[in-house]
């Protein structure tokens, strides 16, 4: 047999490790993907019941008459925080009910800052758009974040129901103020983490 050069053991060890690198990377990626999927789909945080509010300077939201029908909404700023007040068809923990019986008006206020990446959420009443663009089928309007497609349920006290957000939207404390016989909605507090 012809003379063969000696086998380089260091090179052989390197080759043995090089084939392991893609396997380790793929395994790490799979573990991360499973962990992320679990966190996004099964580890969403429930809103506090009852909520704890931190006081804020009182600001006017809108006259009560502007909330004439369910899902009517008004945006406003509370201490520099973008917020929304929504009339909902039933009472929600942390919300405000004005009146009684069939004439009752149920309102809930939320911060409009998404708990995922701090983008601004909007009340979305187009159910087909929510189903198509946000991949969430629902039978009622939702608060949606167009940045990363998180969806929050106003009747669920702002609970994150779809998308990467796992924490609920902070609720805003709403009150009724009467001035000159006309009822108005004001805001004077924001939910704390507890």
What do the predicted segments below correspond to?
Residues 16, 35-134, 154, 170-194:
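N-terminal pre-ligand scaffold of iron-sulfur
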Residues 8, 108, 146:
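Short aromatic/basic micro-patch
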Residues 2-25:
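N-terminal secretory signal peptides and thylakoid transit peptides that target proteins
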Residues 25-37:
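Hydrophobic alpha-helical membrane-insertion segments, chiefly the h-region
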